[in-house]
Amino acid sequence: MLQVYLVRHGETQWNAERRIQGQSDSPLTAKGEQQARQVAERARTLGITHIIASDLGRTQQTARIIADACGCDIILDPRLRELDMGVLEKRHVDSLTDEEEGWRRTLVNGTEDGRIPDGESMQELSVRVQAALADCLKLPEGSRPLLVSHGIALGCLVSTILGLPAYAERRLRLRNCSISRIDYQESPWLASGWVVEMAGDISHLDAPALDELQR
């Protein structure tokens, strides 16, 4: 059975400011660095063999802290990037017009073809993150990879494993530096293939960040 751990990056400056990041970037805050150190301490006990991270700066920062704790190198994979949020990137959530808020909601409220202008659909996101996950099956036997990615990207991945469409209404909250686990297995009791063992665990964090869109 292959176990794959999933970690969202630590809190960033734009998370704290409630700005839309997408594939734009901002650095980790001091709190985000502390979250990364705390999830790294947990990861150190899990027998992690590979760290695979989105190539955006905030995930690289988080991955470096985890990799140092686990004694692993980092493999960068752009397929693990966050959803491209198009023309809304860098905008403050509270500054959106009604029309712009409508664009954002089509992504997370179950609209199949929803996308922000110049951005990416949830289905396109799903295809690339699923491909990145599938490549974990090519790792040597006995591997235990940890993927460092983003809130919407990881939420989409876990939700589709549970059988929801990529564009389903968002019902899974993955806070900064939460940890999830998915397993690939053959089982007489569960569906064969990927199953969700744990999602969004923050028990290792002393002060988890709020979801920036829920404040």
Curated annotation (Swiss-Prot):
Q: Where does substrate bind?
A: 8-15, 21-22, 58, 82-85, 104-105, 151-152
List residue numbers at the site (Transition state stabilizer): 150
Q: Where, by residue number, is the active site?
A: 9, 82
Q: Does the keyword Chloroplast apply?
A: no
* Substrates-to-products reaction catalysed: (2R)-2-phosphoglycerate = (2R)-3-phosphoglycerate
The protein's enzyme class: isomerase
Q: Which keywords, in A-to-Z order, does the entry hold? A: Glycolysis, Isomerase
Q: Which GO terms describe its cellular component?
A: cytoplasm
What Gene Ontology terms describe what this protein does at the molecular function level?
phosphatase activity; phosphoglycerate mutase activity
The EC number on file is: 5.4.2.-
The pathway noted for it is: Carbohydrate degradation; glycolysis; pyruvate from D-glyceraldehyde 3-phosphate: step 3/5
**What biological processes does GO assign it?**
glycolytic process
Q: Extract the Pfam families matched here.
A: His_Phos_1
Q: Which NCBIfam families match?
A: PRK03482.1
Supply the name of the protein.
Answer: Probable phosphoglycerate mutase GpmB
Give the source species.
Answer: Enterobacter sp. (strain 638)
